[in-house]
Every structure is written in C-alpha cells, then in structure tokens.
Amino acid sequence: AVFQDHKSQWHIDCKNSAALELTYEVYAFDNSVRTAWLDTQRGFFNGTSLCLRVHGQEDAAHGLSLKAAKGSNWSVATGLQSVKVNKQGFGEYLASNYDELVDCPFEMGNFWRGEFTACGIPHEFVIAGAMASFDGARLLADTQKICETEIKFWHEKKPTANAPYKRYVFMLNAVEDGYGGLEHRNSTALICNRRDLPTLNMKKMSEGYVTLLGLISHEYFHTWNVKQLRPAEFKRYDYTQENYTELLWFFEGFTS
C-alpha cells in the first residue's frame, strides 16, 4: 500500500525480503532549466524532478538507467559518471550519493556538440535549437577563454590539479525567447534567445552574444562561488522544504 502524508513524502508498506519497484508519472512540460521537459524533439531533466529520495539512503550510491525510445537517434549529455553506455550515451550511470544524482542534469536529443580543454581539463558544450548559421568554433573559443580565466582566478598556483571537477558540461537550450541558467557541480543548464548565438562571418559581437557570454561566465563562476564556497544553510540540503539563506546578495551579487 502507498499513502502520502506530506507534499513531498510517501510511505510504502513492503516486505524487506523483496525488491521494491515503483512506476510513476512526472510532469515534463517546463521548458526552463529548473525541472523537466520531454517532447518529440528534445528531453531534459533535473534529478530532483524525476528521482525519488529514499529516506535514510541518501548517502548510498545511486544508479540511473537511461533507455532510448525505439528508433530514436538521440544522444545524451550529462556530468554524471557513466558506467556502461552506448555511443549515444544511453545506458547505466552511477552517483556516489543522492546529492550527486540530482545535481547532474541530463540533456537528450539531436543537439550540436563541441569540445575544448581549459587548463588541461576537458569541457563539453551541447546546444539544442541552434540555427544553421551558428558559429560553433567562435563560441567554443570564447567560452574557453572564460573558463581558463576563472580557473586561474580560483586556482592560480595549480589550476589543473585543484579545479573541483575532472570534466565540465555546458547544456544550452536555444529558444525563440528565453534567458537563464542554473549551476551544478560539474555542469550548467542554460537557456538563451536563439538570435544571441554567434553566427558565421560575424565581424562584431552582437549585444545578444555579449549577454550570452555574460550568462556563461556567471554560471561557470558559480562552480566555486555557491557550489564550493556556500552558505552554512546549504551544507546539507533539506529536500522536504525550501532552503533559505540571507547571503544571496553576496553569492549572486559578487558573481555578477
């Protein structure tokens, strides 16, 4: 039997000797960086919108299995550690605990993908919704400069050895009208106006592209200022309720 006793909590009566398998539906029609989205063109989710938290098991390792729809040619991008995946990225993933599981969003679809290294660290950039005239090489080169500058700002002496991640992923959703970002431990989810992307033969940076680079810089800086250096209230998240702090003036203001 399953019964709900809180807005975010359910109790299940089950036998200890038997495996428990749950099937449930989730809302996936929020085309932002916050929750989840799924249609015939693209899929995206934060673990907090899909993955239930088992009380008392938050510190245990968590596995995630991702299966492609029959006939799909989608690919997968995420910062979560893969265990056994195919060329498209579908398969098995592993998180060391629940916090890591829900702090690694997934992007799925026929997106544009590019790679670069910053201070010797692999970085990946994927974009859903990019137009044909998009200049990927320009975006990668400019983003690389941003990343190297910020890594050296935080780790001047040993940037490669001291960076808080071994690989980083940018996930950008280019839409008709939108703007925003959400930082994660080794990735960031971004949304921008499609017209803000750099185009081939663009001689001068457009105002929109400058705004996009500012967003990229801001969210990447949060890798340290929020994800590493953070309020005491965020040391251990309480997923049953809102988590408040009076220090956003610093964590958002200083980052900007």
Indicate residue ranges for each PLM-predicted region.
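Juxtacatalytic substrate-recognition/specificity segment
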Residues: 115-247
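Short, solvent-exposed aromatic-acidic interface loops
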Residues: 79-87
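A surface-exposed beta-strand-loop module
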Residues: 1-38
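C-terminal beta-strand-rich structural cap/linker in extracellular carbohydrate-active enzymes
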Residues: 13-25, 86-110
